[in-house]
Structure formats: C-alpha cells, structure tokens
Amino acid sequence: MCGRFAQSQTREDYLALLAEDIERDIPYDPEPIGRYNVAPGTKVLLLSERDEHLHLDPVFWGYAPGWWDKPPLINARVETAATSRMFKPLWQHGRAICFADGWFEWKKEGDKKQPFFIYRADGQPIFMAAIGSTPFERGDEAEGFLIVTAAADQGLVDIHDRRPLVLSPEAAREWMRQEISGKEASEIAASGCVPANQFSWHPVSRAVGNVKNQGAELIQPV
C-alpha cells in the first residue's frame, strides 16, 4: 500500500510538467509546499479538472462513506477499482492526480522495519493516480480521496508490496479529463503507468515512522 509520501516542492515545480498556464485556474504561489511526511487523515493538495481547467484543492486523504463502519480507506487497487460497487462512481467521475516527490515503503529487516524513499530516477516529480468523492472543493472530512495502487507483485523494495500507480505527465493530464470514460481511464492506467525500472530508492531514517516528524532530512539517505 501507499501510506506515506513527500510533497515538498513548489506548486509550479509539479504543474509545469502537466499543463500550460491557460489550462489552469490555480493562483501562483512561490512557496514550497514543504511536506516531507504526508500521512493519511490529513488534507493534501489534489489536482483535478473542472470546466476544462485544472484546479488544486486541499482534500482529505481517506474515504469512509456514511455506511462504512471501519477506518477510512486510503488506497484502491487498479485491478478492481473500475468495477467495484464502492469505487466505480469515483473511477468514472472523481479522477484526480496527487503529485509528489516520492513515497515511502517499509521492508522488514530482522525484527525491525526499515523505511525506504522511492522516487523517479530522472528526478522528475511523480504523478499518482487518485480517485475521490467530488466536488473536491467542498472539503469533506470523511469522503475524500484514495491513491490508486498498481497491480500486485509490482512492489519495488518489497515485491509483495503494492506501489502507487504513477503515471507519466502526459497520461496524468489525460487521466483527469472529465470527458474520458471509465473504460478509457482503465486504458490510460495500463498504458501510461511508469515502469518499475524508472525508479530508484534508498534507506532513510526511521524517524519518518512518526507522522509528527517533518523536514528534508526524512528523505535523505542513511
């Protein structure tokens, strides 16, 4: 699963790879976002399309509709999200992109778990496919968004882990288009997924395990 990631650069660093200024309805903000330890249950900047323009909204990371009596879900599997009763409406009408610098995976080493930071080897930001309950701008505290995870056995540090479905910038832009059908979105997810050999990773401090910890040192090699 994808349960922690870094979103630290400026909005422009991410947006520049996705769309021209004319396609966006997003105020310019030169300040880095500065989040090196983004955790579920917090509001995260999420990119989506409305009225043919891209919008950036702070959206709750987690999804728990009124009838759901368990902790909020944070991931949706790419193999089943498009057809499952719970996620199909979100797949069809609530596609979005969560941009990031990389994400964290933990691997058991002896009796402890070692965290690793995973990122694109070419240094580009990553664009994680997401689905959620629209309209995103309403700021719902329960029905937010989920990160779509890639097919089983595509983990990197741990082959059995499920990594986020990372799309190329071109595929990410298409994924968000409102006129794209659910079936077409499935095709984009399959053809636009960044392959495993495009990623690098290194071990990082176990301090990232505490959601209260922030700072650039959390993504530095140890």
From Swiss-Prot:
Q: What is its EC number?
A: 4.-.-.-, 3.4.-.-
**Phenotype for C2S:** Abolished formation of the DNA-protein cross-link, possibly via the formation of an oxazolidine ring with DNA that is not as stable as a thiazolidine
Active-site positions on this chain: C2 (nucleophile), E105
User: According to the UniProt entry, which residues carry Thiazolidine linkage to a ring-opened DNA abasic site?
Assistant: C2
The answer to whether UniProt assigns keyword Transmembrane helix to this entry is no
Does the keyword Protease feature in the UniProt annotation? yes
Phenotype when changing W67A: Abolished binding to single-stranded DNA
* Effect seen on changing H160A: Reduced formation of the DNA-protein cross-link. Slightly increased binding to single-stranded DNA
Any GO molecular function: single-stranded DNA binding
Result after altering R4A? Reduced binding to single-stranded DNA
Impact after mutating W68A: Abolished binding to single-stranded DNA
Question: What keywords is this UniProt entry annotated with?
Answer: Covalent protein-DNA linkage, DNA damage, DNA-binding, Hydrolase, Lyase, Protease, SOS response
Q: What is known of its domains?
A: The N-terminal catalytic Cys-2 residue forms a thiazolidine linkage to a ring-opened DNA abasic site. Glu-105 catalyzes reversal of the thiazolidine linkage; self-reversal is favoured by duplex DNA formation. Glu-105 is also involved in sensing abasic sites in single-stranded DNA (ssDNA). His-160 stabilizes the abasic sites by forming a hydrogen bond with the O4' hydroxyl group.
Protein name per UniProt? Abasic site processing protein YedK
Q: Which organism is it from?
A: Escherichia coli (strain K12)
